[in-house]
């Protein structure tokens, strides 16, 4: 049983265990112990939140104290660290980020030498060393740290290289929202160097404003800019660049389900698709129906890009993602990458000569409503008898024409309640009913 690692690394509020300088020092040392056995080089990147600089120094100190070398790349998107870990032949990559969360949170995510998430076994080995006394190697064996100055340029060229040489984005006006996060100095350049007219927002990070007013979780500012600029497309990335949400020319926000539909169908129409698509338990039932009508296989994974990746590898498929905007194109990259996913959508638009909304004809989504309930004590909803009964009641009401999902968040102290069906009123009623039932369980647990 892992003590610190959750479904997406280690995450929490800055200054609260384990997101403290003391813990990061020890974590760096523990990681150094694990990864120096293969190669002494560990890559460290971060997003733009102010605490990242503090934790970068702590991790660096711990790693070199264990006798491993460090390569520092500064603020870079999470998928860029996955790519750079591979190209620098590092034994591991570390990202300091809390993704779409506010600046008051931070976290740590590890990548393997191949650019994928590290295994549960490696996480357990790191946790083993976290419980051991920290011992510094002899002075002659202390690791060395170097800063990589051309990391951004390397990643920009990699992203551009995934777009066909014969295609240009000339004539397209695109608003790019970087959430004042890690993509602020790379995403606008990728799209402009491919020929697009780019209007950039969310590109002035100050350490405190990451994800605050814009980005993939707050697309309203992007929507307003797309309409005001009469742009062809709006691209919203989250703070670490692994999520993508789009806004079409009419100001309609398009999520990860829409993106999967566009990419999969374009691959199918151009003869480059095989296998199926992996979604999650949160993927809209309408997406599943649309794929079945076009002969595209569909499989659901647990929520989290880690589980999407695992399911893709199980099936031998290459495309998967989540409604939240994590899109994995395994034929191109090893992890969710917002810029790469946006380029795949743009390729479909250019090659088919269609606007974003025109590429979505054929996808009819079921009404879906999601509510989050903050809890003091985490619990598994499906193991509670009261909630088991409530789920059964809701499913009976839907009569096979919808879905009910209650689950605990893997990264925050939340219980998520989701209902989808063909009728908005029924969906609203059932969500309120289930929220009331969850709150009764939460209250009962608070009294014990």
Curated annotation (Swiss-Prot):
Catalysed reactions, semicolon-separated: alpha-D-glucosamine 1-phosphate = D-glucosamine 6-phosphate
Post-translational modification: Activated by phosphorylation.
PROSITE patterns named in the record: PGM_PMM
Annotated positions of the Phosphoserine modification: 99
Entry-linked InterPro entries: A-D-PHexomutase_a/b/a-I, A-D-PHexomutase_a/b/a-I/II/III, A-D-PHexomutase_a/b/a-II, A-D-PHexomutase_a/b/a-III, A-D-PHexomutase_C, A-D-PHexomutase_C_sf, A-D-PHexomutase_CS, Alpha-D-phosphohexomutase_SF
Enzyme nomenclature, EC number: 5.4.2.10
Disulfide-linked positions: none
Residues involved in Mg(2+) binding: 99, 238, 240, 242
UniProt KW keywords: Isomerase, Magnesium, Metal-binding, Phosphoprotein
Cofactor(s) the protein requires to work: Mg(2+)
Gene Ontology process terms (BP): carbohydrate metabolic process; peptidoglycan biosynthetic process; UDP-N-acetylglucosamine biosynthetic process
Keyword Nucleotide-binding: no
Active-site residue list: 99
Record-level GO cellular component terms: cytosol
Gene Ontology terms, MF aspect: magnesium ion binding; phosphoglucosamine mutase activity; phosphomannomutase activity
Family: Belongs to the phosphohexose mutase family.
Protein name, entry field: Phosphoglucosamine mutase
Organism: Marinomonas sp. (strain MWYL1)
């Amino acid at each position: 049983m892992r003590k610190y690692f959750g479904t997406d690394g280690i995450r929490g509020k800055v200054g609260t265990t384990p997101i403290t300088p003391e813990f990061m020092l020890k974590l760096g040392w523990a990681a150094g112990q694990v990864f120096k056995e293969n190669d002494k080089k560990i890559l460290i990147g971060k997003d733009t939140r102010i605490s990242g600089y503090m934790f970068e120094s702590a991790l660096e100190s711990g790693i070199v104290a264990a006798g491993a070398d460090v390569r520092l790349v500064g603020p870079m998107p999470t998928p860029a660290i996955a790519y750079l870990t591979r190209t620098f032949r590092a034994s591991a990559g570390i990202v300091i980020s809390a993704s779409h969360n506010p600046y008051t949170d931070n976290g740590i995510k590890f990548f393997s030498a191949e650019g994928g998430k590290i295994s549960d076994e490696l996480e357990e080995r790191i946790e083993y060393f976290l419980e051991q006394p920290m011992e510094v190697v002899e002075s002659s064996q202390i690791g060395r740290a170097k800063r990589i100055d051309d990391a951004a340029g390397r990643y920009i060229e990699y992203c551009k290289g995934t777009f066909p040489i014969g295609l240009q984005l000339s004539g397209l006006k695109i608003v790019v929202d970087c959430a004042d996060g890690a993509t602020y100095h790379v995403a606008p350049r990728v799209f402009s160097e491919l020929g697009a007219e780019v209007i950039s927002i969310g590109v002035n990070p100050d350490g405190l404003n990451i994800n605050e007013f814009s980005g993939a979780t707050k697309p309203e500012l992007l929507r307003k800019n797309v309409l005001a600029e009469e742009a062809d497309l709006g691209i919203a990335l989250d703070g670490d660049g692994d999520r993508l949400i789009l806004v079409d020319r009419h100001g309609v926000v398009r999520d990860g389900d829409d993106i999967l539909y566009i990419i999969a169908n374009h691959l199918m129409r151009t003869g480059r698709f095989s296998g199926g698509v992996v979604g999650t338990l949160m993927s809209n039932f309408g997406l599943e129906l649309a794929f079945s009508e076009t002969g595209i296989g569909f499989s659901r994974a647990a929520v989290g890009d880690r589980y999407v990746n695992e399911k893709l590898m199980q099936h031998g498929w290459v495309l998967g993602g989540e409604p939240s905007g994590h899109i994995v194109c395994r034929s191109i990259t090893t992890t969710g990458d917002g810029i790469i996913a946006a380029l795949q959508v743009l390729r479909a638009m250019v090659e088919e000569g269609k606007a974003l909304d025109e590429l979505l004809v054929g996808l009819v989504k079921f009404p879906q409503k999601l509510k989050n309930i903050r809890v003091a004590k985490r619990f598994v909803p499906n193991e509670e008898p009261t909630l088991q009964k409530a789920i059964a009641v809701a499913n009976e009401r839907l009569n096979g024409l919808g879905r009910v999902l209650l689950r605990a968040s893997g990264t925050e102290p939340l219980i998520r309640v989701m209902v989808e069906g063909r009728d908005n009123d029924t969906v609203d009623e059932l969500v309120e009913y289930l929220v009331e039932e969850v709150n009764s369980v939460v209250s009962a647990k608070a009294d014990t």
